[in-house]
Amino acid sequence: IMSLGIHRIWKEKFIDWMSPGQYTKLIDVASGTGDIAMLFCDKTNHTGDVTCIEPNLDMLRQGEKKLKKIKKIQWVNATAEKIPIDDNTFDFYSISYGIRNVTNINDTLQEAFRVLKPGGRFMCLEFSKINNEILKSLYENYSKAIPLIGKFIVGNDEPYKYLINSIQKFYNQEELV
């Protein structure tokens, strides 16, 4: 609701940019309920394999239930900082809307490159600060409204305050790279 549905378009473009071939392997970290995994499977005509890493067991269970018909997805309850997977296993590593929530970003990145095959691709989709002054002003005003909208729609503004604060405190694109 808060992104006005644009986050779905970003996820689809993310997979398009990834451009996975058939029979490729993806590890999707901070998978949530598996949106990226589902899009990856669709893009590879269900020939690609996906391992979803999700630290929240309730979220993982929702994803398993939602995508139970897709047999090419394996679910693992683990954190981004300690992935119980062998080295050099995946063609792609994805993390969408999750890297700003990890406990230790250096450990997360080390794990990412450990599980990627040589030549594998690290893919990160994340909210970040806006550098364009005109858009920045619009975004800042919208950010003030998001918790109010959240409180009106779901009766709780705290998750939306956290979202805005975590985006503001996180690295910008250049700092992350």
Question: How would you label these PLM feature ranges?
Answer:
Residues I53, K129-V177:
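C-terminal alpha-helical "lid/dimerization" subdomain adjacent to the S-adenosyl-L-methionine
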Residues K25-K82:
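Class I SAM-dependent methyltransferase SAM/SAH-binding core
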